[in-house]
Amino acid sequence: MDSKLNKAFHRLIRIIMFKKGVYCKYGKGCVFKEGFFADEETVVGNYNFFGRFTTITKANIGSYCSIAPFVTIGPGEHDLGSVSTSERLNAYKTHKQSLTDGDVFIGNDVWIGTNVVVLRNVRIGDGAVLAAGSIVTKDVPPYAIVGGVPAKIIRYRSACEKEELIRKTNWWNYAPEKAASLLKSNGLMN
């Protein structure tokens, strides 16, 4: 009986864990496409777009971000210092160790391309761009364009030159109409 109960419990966990859906806290005006998943430990700001089959765990995401399909943010990593990397042995360990701890922090107005992976304990600055297919293992400065495996800085966006003025407007704290008006009145948008 114990074996059947154990199997049923693990099946229920698999159903819950792998069921796609929006379980996170999120702000106004967000768009979540088919197959999107974000766990309860994720917090999402306003007016973000999330592409199909994107998976997010343990992340804090600002506002006005554009996240393409098939992006993975915050996947856990196995303990490489352990005798075995198998999670199947965790039930028998005296001191259970979870997959990598730490959250991902993504600023405002960040663009993340298709098939990007952002590992835990990484901070992505405002206005950054992560090129398609990149694996981001380290922090990304504001307005940097990064790409590759592992991701490296390619260059900075032209908005970087106006970063101080952009930050003063705090445009990402407003609804689209007010945000556009602020940017236009400060000469930051045509």
Residue ranges and their predicted role:
Residues 139-143:
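Gly/Pro- and small hydrophobic-enriched strand-loop and loop-to-helix capping segments
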Residues 104, 115-128, 134-138:
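Beta-rich strand-turn-strand
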Residues 111, 171-172:
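Signature tryptophan residues that serve as conserved aromatic anchors
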Residues 1-38:
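Extended, small-residue-rich solenoid/repeat segments and analogous flexible loops
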Residues 16, 38-45, 49-120, 157:
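Flexible, glycine/small-residue-enriched loop-and-beta-strand segment within the central core
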Residues 179-190:
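ABC ATPase nucleotide-binding domains
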